[in-house]
């Protein structure tokens, strides 16, 4: 068994090897001419038949799923189902599920290692999560319980399968839902083997298999032993990856169903026994299990994640959006025929001026209501639906290609720097600093606030001078490259090499795309 004690394993160095890791949110599929011809032929002859048969099997699952829970009360469903329902329906769903994946082209599921019993490991954690085909891992795990969105209950067949599974459901619209999910996971995980195992995809979203995203702590809150489960698709062509940017659902399904044979490897690693410290700290526990799995996979463990609907990467100590919303604003304004350079700023340095959507449209000379609403939504609004025009002025300045980076950073400082007392020097405090980084880089405000505290010299005022701010944004070996890459919206999608890969001695190891290896914790 893997232990949480020091010396149990060595952290993976993502910079070792011949090349750095590519961006985990982007999947590019390059087909040769011969491959294109093959996919065209098989896509017409093979894929439609496979998909049709798979959908027929999917609907055949419904009677078994319905029968297992038919007539049971909510109180009865709070306990694991046993007896004939469990035997007949469980085996029926298991067999039909294997047939479904077989029809989609997954002719072989190769299993390595030994699945632990529910007493040894009440929780299974599977990674990397790269595709909607990943539920295939449920088959060698004997259909463990899963965690899913409550909204999926309304999806035909899928909802019935979730009820059959007695899945733990979380609602995005109910703030108390997450607390109930945590309590339910803890209840099942500490039931002494009464409940089947619970399987998590701790990354929470799909990547391209090239790096592990940051693990969410939900699977580790109970503090019980977990068994890591690795998922690999060792096929000559990666048609299964479904990343934030790359082939969509239908294309991934069509390409995979057009392959003569797809293979999936499922590997059970030794059970990870948490230390006392890890059992009390789910984040530490999650980070250490993530690095164990990354080492076994031979890929880096990163702190990349989704914040809301945006993918976030890490550069040094700062989290930044992979593509700041500022770039999307540029597309909206360009489509409306607006040139940011001719807009009269009218923003007063150091003082906020809150404006309504109507005033925003008048200031930017926009007439189309849809364009106005779309552009206005990019800025943070207060309780009255107003935005600070300083944010608008800085965004327009950043989109004005006629300004140098030095002029732009000076303007940012002038707009948000404040005087503590009459006649004192104007300094950039944490609120203004976090606003600038959030607007220009898409950085979450808490991360920017933490970085601001580190940049301020100990014993001095908790603010940055213009010189200090420009040294940070223009001349810092790491963050200066970040600003130069982000402060101009691209005419075409940037390659990942344009995001800085330098690292400072005090920062975690940075990758070519700006991601970092998870900071070393106990056990390094």
Curated annotation (Swiss-Prot):
Subcellular location: Endoplasmic reticulum membrane
Organism domain of life: Eukaryota
UniProt KW keywords: Acyltransferase, Endoplasmic reticulum, Glycoprotein, Lipid biosynthesis, Lipid metabolism, Membrane, Phospholipid biosynthesis, Phospholipid metabolism, Transferase, Transmembrane, Transmembrane helix
EC primary class: transferase
Extent of Polar residues compositional bias: 495-518
Transmembrane segments: 40-62, 87-107
SMART domains: PlsC
Pathway: Lipid metabolism; phospholipid metabolism
Membrane-protein topology: Multi-pass membrane protein
GO biological-process terms attached to the record: phosphatidylcholine acyl-chain remodeling; phosphatidylethanolamine acyl-chain remodeling; phosphatidylserine acyl-chain remodeling; phospholipid biosynthetic process; phospholipid metabolic process
InterPro entries: LPCAT1-like, Plipid/glycerol_acylTrfase
GO CC annotation, single: endoplasmic reticulum membrane
EC number in record: 2.3.1.23, 2.3.1.n6, 2.3.1.121, 2.3.1.67
Motif (HXXXXD motif): 129-134
Pfam families per UniProt: Acyltransferase
Keyword Repressor appears in the UniProt entry: no
Residues bearing glycans: 152
GO molecular function annotation: 1-acylglycerophosphocholine O-acyltransferase activity; 1-acylglycerophosphoethanolamine O-acyltransferase activity; 1-acylglycerophosphoserine O-acyltransferase activity; 1-alkenylglycerophosphoethanolamine O-acyltransferase activity; 1-alkylglycerophosphocholine O-acetyltransferase activity; lysophospholipid acyltransferase activity
Tissues expressing this chain: Widely expressed with much higher level in brain. Expressed in erythroleukemic cells but not in reticulocytes.
Record's catalysed reaction(s): a 1-acyl-sn-glycero-3-phosphoethanolamine + an acyl-CoA = a 1,2-diacyl-sn-glycero-3-phosphoethanolamine + CoA; a 1-O-(1Z-alkenyl)-sn-glycero-3-phosphoethanolamine + an acyl-CoA = a 1-O-(1Z-alkenyl)-2-acyl-sn-glycero-3-phosphoethanolamine + CoA; a 1-acyl-sn-glycero-3-phosphocholine + an acyl-CoA = a 1,2-diacyl-sn-glycero-3-phosphocholine + CoA; a 1-O-alkyl-sn-glycero-3-phosphocholine + acetyl-CoA = a 1-O-alkyl-2-acetyl-sn-glycero-3-phosphocholine + CoA
Region (Disordered): 490-524
The UniProt record lists the keyword Acyltransferase: yes
CDD domains xref list: LPLAT_LPCAT1-like
Family statement drawn from the similarity comment of this UniProt entry: Belongs to the 1-acyl-sn-glycerol-3-phosphate acyltransferase family.
Function: Displays acyl-CoA-dependent lysophospholipid acyltransferase activity with a subset of lysophospholipids as substrates; converts lysophosphatidylethanolamine to phosphatidylethanolamine, 1-alkenyl-lysophatidylethanolamine to 1-alkenyl-phosphatidylethanolamine, lysophosphatidylglycerol and alkyl-lysophosphatidylcholine to phosphatidylglycerol and alkyl-phosphatidylcholine, respectively. In contrast, has no lysophosphatidylinositol, glycerol-3-phosphate, diacylglycerol or lysophosphatidic acid acyltransferase activity. Prefers long chain acyl-CoAs (C16, C18) as acyl donors.
Protein name: Lysophospholipid acyltransferase LPCAT4
Source organism (scientific name): Mus musculus (Mouse)
Lineage, uppermost ranks: Eukaryota, Metazoa, Chordata, Craniata, Vertebrata
Name of the gene encoding the protein in the UniProt record: Lpcat4
